[in-house]
Amino acid sequence: MTAPLKAIDGSADLPALMNDLASRARAAARVLALAPAAQKNRALEAMERLIRARVDTIIAANAEDVVEAKAAGITSSFLDRLTLTPARVAAMADGIAAVREVADPIGIVTESWQRPNGMTIERVRVPLGVIGVIFESRPNVAADAGVLCLKSGNAVILRGGSDSFRSCRAIHECLVEGLREAGLPDAAITLVPTRDRAAVGLLLSGLNGGVDVIVPRGGKNLVARVEAEARVPVFAHLEGVNHVYVDGAADLEMAKSIVLNAKMRRTGVCGAAETLLIDRASQDKIKPLVDTLINAGCEVRGDDAVRAADARVKPASNEDWDTEYLDAVIAAKVVDGVEGAIAHIQAHGSHHTDAIVTADVAAADKFLNEVDSAIVLHNASTQFADGGEFGFGAEIGIATGKFHARGPVGVEQLTSFKYRIHGTGQTRP
């Protein structure tokens, strides 16, 4: 088994260690803010190459994490998020390549105007600074967050879950070597070298001004803790209670395909559908939709109308409408048209991702305009709630708040702006 780093079991020096990491990251952020796009892209090219070359090393490290997690009795959905395969490592490398192709936003003048006194004002994109990313079981987050922050000129401090510690360390080694090949500082992408949970609290404190933004990736308990305790801004979503509404004007075959994909493509991702809403005007669609789900191995929990259509449907409780299962389970309910669907989502949704399936353009427009979620879709699966699918290369998370970033947080969303003003000696009267 890979030898643990010194702080893995806790250390009286942990506050000093974390403050030192933040200090080094801040220094690296100053370098990255001025690094040309070509230099950052050289680092990304090297990272992609190293990830591909070391797939066996990464999977071996991950296998140790998986063995330990199984012994701890983790759930099947958690195990799916933790496990790396050759295909998933290849996808990680593909994501790095995609980020490399994204235009560098830093230094871009997004708007420019001249005032009556002759001054020219420019609004220019700049990095946020140092970003702290706290995540749980998904080791691929280490790569996604690392390269997105690099491309956007930010330094990042990664604090992965103890379950994925070895996997993240193997991935991080590739990222750091890529930085070195491009002549960029190691501290541009820092992995907290400990499983000590106290490190999370220290990171949330902002480390004496060393961290500018926190991004949590994990379950609702982690996200709730981050939002409650963080002393710096947070980009986060609490959970993904996502809905697919099948309207009376929906094509049945399209609806079956979308519902099946939205729920069962990957049940453990935040874009998975958790509730199926069916228009009362199309109750003939209930049975085939339920058949499609149950035949794919999904448990369906429904209201009386859904249960009347299929005896295999289990009764839904009030809690089911508010549950993010992250498993092969879905709640199903009959509603009174698009108005009923919107009302249900307003009462039980999490402002993440919701979809309507319909051929009625007016119903689709009403749904898209009135559902207050970061991502709303017409005739498409909720599993497209992903930065890569948006053309962002990858994502550091899905933000469901309304300040600064909303939806998939990619390279551009990890920037802010400043104003540059050019004068010719103007003074204010």
UniProtKB/Swiss-Prot annotation:
Transmembrane segments: none annotated. Pathway: Amino-acid biosynthesis; L-proline biosynthesis; L-glutamate 5-semialdehyde from L-glutamate: step 2/2. One of its GO terms (cellular component) is cytoplasm. It is found in: Cytoplasm. GO terms for molecular function: glutamate-5-semialdehyde dehydrogenase activity; NADP binding. Signal peptide: none annotated. InterPro entries: Ald_DH/histidinol_DH, Ald_DH_C, Ald_DH_N, Aldehyde_DH_dom, G-glutamylP_reductase_CS, Glu-5-SA_DH, GPR_dom. It catalyses: L-glutamate 5-semialdehyde + phosphate + NADP(+) = L-glutamyl 5-phosphate + NADPH + H(+). Its EC number is 1.2.1.41. It comes from the Bacteria. Its main location: cytoplasm. GO terms for biological process: L-proline biosynthetic process. Keywords: Amino-acid biosynthesis, Cytoplasm, NADP, Oxidoreductase, Proline biosynthesis. Pfam families: Aldedh. Disulfide bonds: none annotated. Belongs to the gamma-glutamyl phosphate reductase family. Catalyzes the NADPH-dependent reduction of L-glutamate 5-phosphate into L-glutamate 5-semialdehyde and phosphate. The product spontaneously undergoes cyclization to form 1-pyrroline-5-carboxylate. PANTHER family: DELTA-1-PYRROLINE-5-CARBOXYLATE SYNTHASE, GLUTAMATE SEMIALDEHYDE DEHYDROGENASE. This is Gamma-glutamyl phosphate reductase.
